[in-house]
Each structure stands twice: as C-alpha cells, then as structure tokens.
Amino acid sequence: MEKRTPHTRLSQVKKLVNAGQVRTTRSALLNADELGLDFDGMCNVIIGLSESDFYKSMTTYSDHTIWQDVYRPRLVTGQVYLKITVIHDVLIVSFKEK
C-alpha cells in the first residue's frame, strides 16, 4: 500500500534523531559508507531533510501495518533513496544512491 503523504511528520523524525533515538540496518550503513557517509553523516542528512525531499509512504512487504517514509534528498554525491520507519525510534531501513 502506498500514499503520497508522510506517515510520520518530519519534525517528529528530526526530534527523535536529535535525541539519539535512531538506529540503522546493516545494509543501509554499508550503502551509506559507499557514499562516504558514516552513521553521524546519515543522521545529518535526516536532520537536513525538507518537506520537498519527501517521495512517498509505503507499507512493508511483511507487515502492512508498518509504514515506511521514503525521501529522496540531493547530496553532493547525487540523489539518495532514504527509507525510514518510526515505531519507538527512527530506523533507517535504506540509504542508497538513487
């Protein structure tokens, strides 16, 4: 299922990241490393997101009650496909070059 509005407000996502309530999947961290970013760099990208970077929201394949917000910010290295899930904290699910 998809929708064109964020499931979680960007201000809430940034608040959680600023509070250190963020984690990442191994694959997202490895992909970010290929772009020259470490975990702190990934968090900085999220803090720098704007509403115009939003692309879509979608449910996970395994559980249609869990929503993932997809952003496509433009970095110096190019455009990034960034997928996050917010339940109790921010989980960076995907972070790769688009």
Swiss-Prot record:
UniProt-listed InterPro entries: MqsR_sf, MqsR_toxin
Top EC class for this record: hydrolase
One matching Pfam family: MqsR_toxin
Transcription recorded as keyword: yes
Induction: Induced by amino acid starvation, glucose starvation and when translation is blocked. Also induced by nalidixic acid, azolocillin and H(2)O(2). It has been suggested that MqsA represses its own operon. Induction is decreased in the absence of the Lon protease suggesting, by homology to other toxin-antitoxin systems, that Lon may degrade the MqsA antitoxin. Transcription is activated by MqsA. A member of the mqsRA operon. Most highly induced gene in persister cells. Degrades its own transcript. This operon induced by ectopic expression of toxins RelE, HicA and YafQ but not by MazF or HicA.
GO molecular function, one term: RNA endonuclease activity
Phenotype reported upon loss of the gene: No loss of ability to form persister cells in MG1655, represses persister cell formation in BW25113. Deletion decreases biofilm formation in LB medium. Deletion has also been shown to increase biofilm formation. Deletion at 48h, in flow cells, leads to a reduction in biomass, substratum coverage and changes the biofilm architecture from a 54 micron thick film with microcolonies to one with nearly no biomass and only a few colonies remaining. Deletion abolishes motility.
Subunit structure: Might be a dimer. Also reported to be a monomer. Crystallizes as a heterotetramer with MqsA, MqsR-MqsA(2)-MqsR. Purifies as a possible heterohexamer of 2 MqsR dimers and 1 MqsA dimer. When the 2 dissociate the MsqR mRNA interferase becomes active.
Protein name, UniProt field: mRNA interferase toxin MqsR
Organism: Escherichia coli (strain K12)
